Amino acid sequence: MKVGFISLGCPKNLVDSEVMMGQLVAKGHELTSHPDQADVLVVNTCSFIDPAKKESVDTILEMAEYKKIGRAKKLIVAGCLVERYRGDIRTEMPEVDALIGTNELDSIVDICEGMPPSTNPLEPYLYHDLTPRVLATPRHFAYMKIAEGCDHPCTFCVIPQYRGAFRSRRFESVVSEATRLFQQGIREINLIGQDTTCYGEDLGLKDGLAELLARLAQIETPQEKWIRFLYAYPNKVTQKLLDTLAEHAALAKYIDMPLQHASANVLKRMKRGASGDIFLKLIERIRRTIPGVAIRTSFIVGFPGETAADFDELCAFVEAAKFDNLGVFTYSDEDTSASYALDGKVDGRTIQNRKRRLMAIQRKIARARNRGLVGKEVPVLVSGVSGETDLLWEARMSTQAPEIDGVTLINDFEGSEPRAGEIRRLRITEAHDYDVVGTLLAPTEPAPVLPAGPGLINIESLVAV
């Protein structure tokens, strides 16, 4: 049976798709990148905010057309949209033949084969090191989920409603999977979860993430490796965690820490607490402990009750903090979120104007930071030929996370031609708003051994991501 997959949304959702694809391949089924050639089409959806819901619905309807013109006889919808709108999908989208919630990933084979699913949708699901996975990322890096669910009460967020309570993977399960990935030739592992800094709390571990990172850094590999974690909660960033990042060369000097806002008034309404002053002290401690660290954050503008003064406070905070990377989300008024009932809604035009203003501030900061890198030599992980032009190669510094940060472009090289998956030093020669450009220096390590075989596919072979 040929199955075509479309994975929408965040890396956590992508890992769920990889798990489902892995189970299908383990049972002898074939994956195809051509929806018109698939016997079964699967859309793994996102429903975090309104634009994500719209993209999910549009994609489902697009794939439904392939049931008419192609060979597909079954359309399966999976993921977060199913958890939020299972009943609506069943009644309003007759094109959909089956649904798979976030706790039902193990049912993918049964449903594709027309068998009754054996999975209990009410039992929390979390994959382990023996679960088959087909990697859908480029062959030199992978995402690895270390936890699922969330216990934080953020009023704007609906994730706990369909991902459930926080639960960690077993320590040795994570180590085992990471070891296998590195043995297969993966050069960079990105640890993910709704809140990675809570890792191990439910297992009785104190500073569980720090312990895990230290253990992963000690995995023996034939070549240099990078390990980073994403989605840190600010009040969970302990000194032990910072000391661990500073101690081990394999750990990327990078912290992704969504702060959401800097006004104490807005943060209180978000049920996150803290303030800009508290965050500035934390940022100073991070930079003091880890020289050269890159800090990424994200903010929500237009949250109910956000006044002009609150937004001005956020802008002043960003100018003071000087983040390396920053993302801005416009508030999405989700009908099942606690913030939906709050008063003081901000109009759409004001929200968009605030986003533009905040990004303009960050653009100047990022440009100045990048200019300070010109002339420096840094290690980069080569990604391959640039997607924008085949005249350039693309790479990333360890301070640039995949898919969300800027990139390092290679316009010249010394020695052998760049190869995807190799880590080489690069001399930065140009700086732009979010990207830098440089010359790749001659290699000092053997050519990378990239993973191959039926267990791994490249991201381009997915129908869409």
From Swiss-Prot:
The keyword Ribosomal protein does not apply. InterPro entries: Elp3/MiaA/NifB-like_rSAM, Methylthiotransferase, Methylthiotransferase_CS, Methylthiotransferase_N, Methylthiotransferase_N_sf, NA-bd_OB-fold, Ribosomal_uS12_MeSTrfase_RimO, rSAM. GO terms for cellular component: cytosol. [4Fe-4S] cluster 1 binds at residues 10, 46, 80. Its main location: cytoplasm. The keyword Iron-sulfur applies. It comes from the Bacteria. Its cofactor is [4Fe-4S] cluster. Keywords: 4Fe-4S, Cytoplasm, Iron, Iron-sulfur, Metal-binding, S-adenosyl-L-methionine, Transferase. Disulfide bonds: none annotated. Its EC number is 2.8.4.4. Residues 1-117 form the MTTase N-terminal domain. One of its GO terms (molecular function) is 4 iron, 4 sulfur cluster binding. [4Fe-4S] cluster 2 binds at residues 150, 154, 157. Residues 371-442 form the TRAM domain. It is found in: Cytoplasm. Residues 136-369 form the Radical SAM core domain. SMART domains: Elp3 (SM00729). GO terms for biological process: tRNA modification. It catalyses: L-aspartate(89)-[ribosomal protein uS12]-hydrogen + (sulfur carrier)-SH + AH2 + 2 S-adenosyl-L-methionine = 3-methylsulfanyl-L-aspartate(89)-[ribosomal protein uS12]-hydrogen + (sulfur carrier)-H + 5'-deoxyadenosine + L-methionine + A + S-adenosyl-L-homocysteine + 2 H(+). HAMAP family: MTTase_RimO. Catalyzes the methylthiolation of an aspartic acid residue of ribosomal protein uS12. Belongs to the methylthiotransferase family. RimO subfamily. This is Ribosomal protein uS12 methylthiotransferase RimO. It comes from Solibacter usitatus (strain Ellin6076).
